[in-house]
């Protein structure tokens, strides 16, 4: 069988004599496929009109080359650093190193500060009665009288309506802005369940009445730190459990009425102020005799000097060996200040701490008490 001679298909727009008539435009000049300039003068007008745009880069009627997109596949394995890549910071750093040359040492990256874990210890308290309004302000309580407080010649002890379980290693200190005519004696409550009270001493010549909201008593929770034995000089051993020291009289003391004296104790300590702060707090039994002791901050490498005031109209005799003040070593930052011009005693400015006082129910209160009892029993057994 003889096959018929079938001619090849011919494009009607181009002549057969042209050798490039069957080739696409991209194959005629392979070195000019990315050239966006005007075509050369040798090409005809029909070839210029049929040339595809450079972005598509047509090779044939059925195949097209497209622009390559940026791949984000490797970003899963090599994540970018937000701080170094922000606003081209990494590229600018490389360019700076190239300009400086190999002699300049590379710049060390700034270390990031480790974030401290937030550890806040909660201490539960309960309120009772209607004589005082108690509010929690973070690490401290504020008690304000809601009724008129009447003070007799010597003064009185007021229950603030606050019960709390003080954990081991802490103490509660009452601090007050002294109203005119009276002094709120600074007092300390140690480890265990405590009913917080305040001692008000009348320093006027007659009875005194305080209107509502006149007494503003702050209750601070302070950690009690125990110094090393070599850091104390002529101080007796601290009390077990409460971790505080005593300052006692070595000879009898006689105070005239309405007179003050500076007592010097031959004792000292070597604790640095940046690590610990030594507080001198008066003993509560002095308030019954209307003897006031100015609370102060005991500086290191110095003798203890205390100011004692007899607020009564009679002579007061104090025996030798009587405890005059309590010594507490706590966190730094506490400074003494005078609340007002009429104040005869100093107060303490206590900075904020990580403690949080929370008003809880009976269940929370008794649970904390059981924990303290179990810890006390285990320590006694040990």
Swiss-Prot record:
Enzyme Commission no: 3.6.1.23
* Class in the EC hierarchy, top level: hydrolase
GO MF annotation, one: dUTP diphosphatase activity
What's in the keyword line of the UniProt record? Answer: Hydrolase, Magnesium, Metal-binding, Nucleotide metabolism
Q: Where is this region: Disordered?
A: 1-60, 97-118
Q: In which pathway does it act?
A: Pyrimidine metabolism; dUMP biosynthesis; dUMP from dCTP (dUTP route): step 2/2
InterPro entries (alphabetical): dUTPase-like, dUTPase-like_sf, HSV_DUT
Which catalytic reaction applies to this protein?
Answer: dUTP + H2O = dUMP + diphosphate + H(+)
GO biological-process terms attached to the record: dUMP biosynthetic process; dUTP metabolic process
Q: Where is the composition biased (Pro residues)?
A: 1-12
Bias (Basic and acidic residues) occurs at: 100-118
Residue ranges the record marks as coiled coil = none
**SUPFAM superfamilies recorded for this chain?**
dUTPase-like
Superkingdom of this entry's organism?
A: Viruses
What cofactors does this protein use? Mg(2+)
> What is the role of the protein in this entry?
Involved in nucleotide metabolism: produces dUMP, the immediate precursor of thymidine nucleotides and decreases the intracellular concentration of dUTP to avoid uracil incorporation into viral DNA.
What family does the database annotate? Belongs to the dUTPase family.
- Quote the protein name from its UniProt record: Deoxyuridine 5'-triphosphate nucleotidohydrolase
User: Which species is listed as the source?
Assistant: Murid herpesvirus 1 (strain Smith) (MuHV-1)
